[in-house]
Amino acid sequence: MPAAWMPVLRLGAYASRVPGPAGGDGAVPIAITCFTRGLDIRKEKADVLCPAGCPLEEFSVFGNIVYASVSSICGAAVHRGVISISGGPVRVYSLPGRENYSSVDANGIQSQTLARWSASFTVTKGKSSTQEATGQAVSTARPPTGKRLKKTPEKKTGNKDCKADIAFLIDGSFNIGQRRFNLQKNFVGKVALMLGIGTEGPHVGLVQASEHPKIEFYLKNFTSAKDVLFAIKEVGFRGGNSNTGKALKHTAQKFFTADTGMRKGIPKVVVVFIDGWPSDDIEEAGIVAREFGVNVFIVSVAKPIPEELGMVQDVAFVDKAVCRNNGFFSYHMPNWFGTTKYVKPLVQKLCSHEQMMCSKTCYNSVNIAFLIDGSSSVGDSNFRLMLEFVSNIAKTFEISDIGAKIAAVQFTYDQRTEFSFTDYSTKENVLAVIRSIRYMSGGTATGDAISFTVRNVFGPVRDSPNKNFLVIITDGQSYDDVRGPAAAAHDAGITIFSVGVAWAPLDDLKDMASKPKESHAFFTREFTGLEPIVSDIIRGICRDFLESQQ
């Protein structure tokens, strides 16, 4: 019998256990969430009620008709056409585990492949208890009380001090063999457990390097250590050449996307396990990974003995593949036995986000303060244009608690900190507070304002790994000296961009700006002319940041 028919025959065997919808027992359906999985239902048969409005793009579904139990029940029901996004009753049948869950695009959901899983389920159209009794269709939009179902807030879990999106690239070649492959998986499981995986902590995925690289699961598939450990256990040994370079390049290019669970502003990390030495060139893959902003760690096990060195393409493969050749990104274990003592030091490295040099870009590793002129000559309508200018710059950057940070000070003769670098850690909150800034009105003392900002805004973050920038926007001449305070700011490592409008003297703008003055000082006659300067400021910040990294 052709092998291609085997899944159909298996499904036929499963189907013999599955009664039609009319065979229900009249039980009241259990209300579940959009993301309740098959493994969360511990019954051979269950009637559930999927809510309306589940986001299709966030469903995690593995297989077709028969789904891995790690799949979303409601996602599987929509995928199979049992319900629409309006929700409704679904009957769930538990099935044995299997191999080769297929990927099928159906009803707006692209299910994913999975090599193997320990349990499965299938779904059919269910009936509510009212339908069972009367045969009448009933609405599932509201419960019988007429009140809306309360959405259960997602519990925030994980180690908040360890923010990273991590791909474990394990060795699945014949070189490592089945026994050491299992020891390798045990070690990866221990690392995953200690990381503190969760919605607020690190997210992890797994790629196996063999003849052809295979992504076993993505960042978005599991957000608890328990599920990750189970998924690692289920990964099967593939064999073939290690082709680590090919696998690393594939991981850097394909693994980290928004669709697969990558989070903005979070360091991207690949931990490469190499048993012995790679069978292909790994240097080029390291270059590609760095270009994609990926921090590559190499965990090497059992270095080649002198007699084997002739078979190694490049004995310096570790130094050429890691993010930086500074010792931080390389890690060695003598063998796969007694590896528990190596877990904690590796976890500490993976959680040191300030050391993730390859993740640092001008968009996620800068502190930018805006010094905004609130003097009487500006006027309320023009002040709004200044705030729009500030917002358009700020929204370009990847603002987060470990990424770019924004602050704002308004000045007249006095100074007012509108918000500091540590007040807001999301782009949405930063943009909202910028819009809410109230116009002060008064005189113009720019020099005092610079000194105030250096002391009170940049002072608390003087030890930050981010590069510091100050953008000054003013429309007139300062009543005090600007040269001295600006020089002090430069000496403190703060790069200044000065933006003048209307009556702002060019000499003051140049005195405040960092060198070269021509690329750090800007002027426009009208407040409506601020908009074209936005891109100049952003390019300038990125240019200065890159120069500081060399």
UniProtKB/Swiss-Prot annotation:
Q: Where is the VWFA domain?
A: 165-350, 367-537
| A single cellular component GO annotation | extracellular region
Cross-referenced InterPro entries, in alphabetical order? ECM_Assembly_Org, LCCL, LCCL_sf, VWF_A, vWFA_dom_sf
Write out the PTM section of this UniProt entry.
Answer: N-glycosylated.
Q: Which cysteines are joined by disulfide bonds?
A: 34-50, 54-74
SMART domains listed in its UniProt record: LCCL, VWA
Domain named LCCL: residues: 28-121
The entry lists its GO molecular-function terms as:
collagen binding
Q: List keywords of the entry alphabetically.
A: Disulfide bond, Extracellular matrix, Glycoprotein, Repeat, Secreted, Signal
Coarse class of the protein's main subcellular location: secreted
Biased-composition ranges for Polar residues?
A: 126-139
Q: Which residues form the signal peptide?
A: 1-15
Question: Whom does it interact with, and what assembly results?
Answer: Monomer. May form homodimer. Interacts with type II collagen. Interacts with ANXA2. Interacts with SLC44A2.
What name appears for this protein in its UniProt entry? Cochlin
Write down the species: Cavia porcellus
Specify the taxonomic lineage.
Answer: Eukaryota, Metazoa, Chordata, Craniata, Vertebrata
